[in-house]
Amino acid sequence: MIKGISALELLHRETASTNRIKTLCGTLDKMLCGGIIIGKGIIELCGVPGSGKTLLCKILALNIQIPKSIGGPGLNAIYIDSEGGFSDNRLREISKSTLNYINAKKKTEDMTCENLIKNIKYIRIFDLEELINVLTLLPSMCKNNNIGIIIIDSISMLIRICNLNNQPYRLKMQQKIAKTLENMSKEYSLSIIVTNHMTKKYFDDQKKKDQFANVATGKKNLEPSLGLSWNSLICERLILKREKDLKADSEALNTISVTNSFGEVAFFKINLNGIQDY
């Protein structure tokens, strides 16, 4: 049976501060209209290795725990790791920023770095079959653990290595996974975050060249992996990219740009405790 909600209820959901996960980076939260929205479908973080995808995932897993009494969702997180890049030490460093924000608003003895980390359920998987098995368990896990966000880091790693010579099967599986995640997002009011890699594409004809600004014929261009069919399965894409710091006399790529589906761009810098405004 198809269930619907009124347009007014949808508006209230999207504008409520407790229905957004703040990044605590002013420029990024402004671009995101207050933060990452909860319950709207799949949101993809896309970029090359080292562009800050996993860092931003950890920040969201921590910041979703900001209490409702100070405008946060007050929920917990599930973090599904397919690449083994999850670092407990880095998570502890980042948790200090979340805790400082909470204590500045309303100091509470119940909220500590240890509790913030404890409220993130970590699941390590190695292939698509394991992910599908986990997906069948997620509804009960969400109900019993006050879950508000599910993070899969990364989705592309699992799909790309699945039956490499059987593209129809891969397409079928990614559609099945995306539909399951989208339904869960709306039924249980969850934020679904997945990370995706960039892949090299080559264009040899004028028509394709014109579709991508500043791409010369025959030269490589970076695009989100998983193809065009995947694009229709997500509700938002944020592309992360390392940039040179124009404010500093350095060639280091220590600034991150984030571009949304509308072409809007926000910048932040990575620091010891997470991210900060550029």
Place the predicted regions along the sequence by residue.
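The Walker A/P-loop phosphate-binding site
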Residues: 1-105
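Amphipathic alpha-helical transducer elements in NTP-driven molecular machines
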Residues: 22-25, 29, 39, 54, ...
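Solvent-exposed alpha-helical segments within well-ordered globular domains of core cellular machineries
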Residues: 26, 30, 62, 89-93, ...
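Conserved catalytic network of the ASCE P-loop NTPase/AAA+ motor domain
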Residues: 35-38, 68-73, 112-115, 140-145, ...
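Hydrophobic/aromatic beta-strand patches that form the interior of the parallel beta-sheet core
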Residues: 43-45, 78-80, 121-123, 193, ...
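Conserved inter-motif catalytic segment of the P-loop NTP-binding fold
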Residues: 72-167
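Conserved P-loop NTPase nucleotide-binding/switch module
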Residues: 150-179, 204-212
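Phosphate-binding/switch region of NTP-binding enzymes
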Residues: 172, 179, 183-278
